[in-house]
Curated annotation (Swiss-Prot):
Similarity comment: family membership: Belongs to the krueppel C2H2-type zinc-finger protein family.
Keyword Zinc applies: yes
Any one GO molecular-function label of the UniProt entry: DNA-binding transcription activator activity, RNA polymerase II-specific
Main location: nucleus
Any one GO BP annotation for this protein: myelination
GO cellular component annotations of the record: nucleus
Protein name: Zinc finger protein 24
Maturation and modification: Sumoylated.
Top-level lineage group: Eukaryota
Positions of crosslink type Glycyl lysine isopeptide (Lys-Gly) (interchain with G-Cter in SUMO2): 22, 27, 147, 177, 236, 277, 286, 361, 367
Residues carrying Phosphotyrosine: 335
PANTHER family named in the record: ZINC FINGER PROTEIN, ZINC FINGER PROTEIN-RELATED
Function in brief: Transcription factor required for myelination of differentiated oligodendrocytes. Required for the conversion of oligodendrocytes from the premyelinating to the myelinating state. In the developing central nervous system (CNS), involved in the maintenance in the progenitor stage by promoting the cell cycle. Specifically binds to the 5'-TCAT-3' DNA sequence. Has transcription repressor activity in vitro.
Length: 368
C-alpha cells in the first residue's frame, strides 16, 4: 500500500469483547460530486456495539491533535449510529437504549446486552420477561430504582437559588442543557420506592432495601434539587406481581444475599454473578445464561413465529410482540402522560410525546 493511500485511510482501533485489538480501515474516496464519501460495506462491519464502546472510551490522548480527535469521534459515532442506513427515529432509539442500559444495575446490564435489543422497547421487554421467569419478582426495586419522569421546577421558586455561587449555577445550567436530550428520552421506569416523595434512593440504600418498597434517600448532585421526579408513566401495577407472604425463602445467594424459595431459581440467579452461559446456539455460536433466552434467539434463525393474532392472523416470535400488536384491535392505551392525560398504546409513542413537554419546561426554566 502506498504512503498516499495510508494517509487517505481513517484507522480506528477497536477493542473487541476479548480486549484484543483489531484495525478497521475505512477507505474514503471521492464521490461523483467531488465530496468525500465512505465506501463502507455496512453489512460486513462488526457489531455496532463495538463502535459504541470505542466512541465512549475514546480519549484525547488517542489522537495527535484536536482536529484529529473530532474526526475520529465523528467517524466512530457514524459507524455506531449508521445514519446512512438508519432513520432519525432509529438513531434516537439507539441513544435512548444506550442510556437506559447504562442506568441499570450491572447484573441487569449483562442480561439485557446478551439479548442484543435494538431499541428501548425491546430492552424493557427483556426485563419484564426476566421478572416473570425469576422466582423473586417481588423485589422490583433493582428494576425500577430510578424515576424516568423528570420534571423541571421553576428556579424562581427555589429560595436558595438566588444565593448560589457561580460554579453551582454553571452546574445547574449544564444539567438543563444535557437533560433536554439525555434524560428526557427515558421516562419509563416506575419506581414504587420513590413514588410518594419523588426522591431518588442512592444505589447503596437500594441494594440493602431487600423486600421493602419504600427506600429513603434523596438525589445528591451537589446543587439544589431543581429536578423533580414525577409520577410513573407506566400503567399502575407494571413490574408488580402479587406475592404469597406464607412462602418461605430458604435459598440464599452468597454474592448478594438475595433469597429464593426454590434452588433452581437460585442457580439461575447465580449465573448473573458468574457470567456462566451454558446454552449455546449451534447456528451462530452465541451463548446464553438461560435456556428460555436461547429458545427466543433461535427464532431469529428459524423464522418461527408461534404467537398468532386471532383477529388478523399476524404472527410474532415473542409473546410481548403479540400483546403490543393486539392493542391495535382492542384500542387499549395503557401508557398515559401524567402531565396532560393523553394515552398511547405503545410506550415508545409516549416517550416521543413527553419530549415535547420536557422541552417546553426546560425552555421556560432557561428564560427565568
Amino acid at each position: 500500500m502506498s504512503a498516499q493511500s495510508v494517509e487517505e485511510d481513517s484507522i480506528l482501533i477497536i477493542p473487541n469483547p476479548d480486549e484484543e485489538e483489531k484495525i478497521l480501515r475505512v477507505k474514503l474516496e471521492e464521490d461523483p460530486d467531488g465530496e468525500e464519501g465512505s465506501s463502507i460495506s455496512w453489512n460486513h462491519l462488526p457489531d455496532p456495539e463495538i463502535f459504541r464502546q470505542r466512541f465512549r472510551q475514546f480519549g484525547y490522548q488517542d489522537s495527535p491533535g484536536p482536529r484529529e480527535a473530532v474526526s475520529q469521534l465523528r467517524e466512530l459515532c457514524r459507524l455506531w449510529l449508521r445514519p446512512e442506513t438508519h432513520t432519525k427515529e432509529q438513531i434516537l432509539e439507539l441513544v435512548v437504549l444506550e442510556q437506559f442500559v447504562a442506568i441499570l444495575p450491572r447484573e441487569l446490564q449483562t442480561l439485557v446486552r446478551e439479548h442484543h435489543p435494538e431499541n428501548g422497547e425491546e430492552a424493557v421487554t427483556v426485563l419484564e420477561d426476566l421478572e416473570s421467569e425469576l422466582d423473586d419478582p417481588g423485589q422490583p426495586v433493582s428494576l425500577r430504582r430510578r424515576k424516568r419522569e423528570v420534571l423541571v421546577e421553576e428556579i424562581a421558586s427555589q429560595e436558595d437559588a438566588q444565593g448560589l455561587p457561580s460554579s453551582e449555577l454553571d452546574a445547574v445550567e449544564n444539567q438543563l442543557k444535557w437533560a433536554s436530550w439525555e434524560l428526557h428520552s427515558l421516562r419509563h421506569c416506575d419506581d414504587d420506592a420513590t413514588a410518594e416523595n419523588g426522591a431518588l434512593a442512592p444505589k447503596q440504600e437500594i441494594a440493602s432495601a431487600g423486600e421493602s418498597h419504600e427506600v429513603p434517600g434523596t438525589l445528591n448532585i451537589g446543587v439544589p434539587q431543581i429536578f423533580k421526579y414525577g409520577e410513573t408513566c407506566f400503567p399502575k401495577g407494571r413490574f408488580e406481581r402479587k406475592r404469597n407472604p406464607s412462602r418461605k425463602k430458604q435459598h440464599i445467594c452468597d454474592e448478594c444475599g438475595k433469597h429464593f424459595s426454590q434452588g433452581s431459581a437460585l442457580i439461575l440467579h447465580q449465573r448473573i454473578h458468574s457470567g456462566e452461559k451454558p446454552y449455546g446456539c449451534v447456528e451462530c455460536g452465541k451463548a446464553f445464561s438461560r435456556s428460555s433466552i436461547l429458545v427466543q434467539h433461535q427464532r431469529v434463525h428459524t423464522g418461527e413465529k408461534p404467537y398468532k393474532c386471532l383477529e388478523c392472523g399476524k404472527a410474532f416470535s415473542q409473546n410481548s410482540g403479540l400483546i403490543n400488536h393486539q392493542r391495535i384491535h382492542t384500542g387499549e392505551k395503557p401508557y398515559e402522560c401524567v402531565q396532560c392525560g393523553k394515552s398511547y398504546s405503545q410506550s415508545s409513542n409516549l416517550f416521543r410525546h413527553q419530549r415535547r413537554h420536557n422541552a417546553e419546561k426546560l425552555l421556560n426554566v432557561v428564560k427565568v
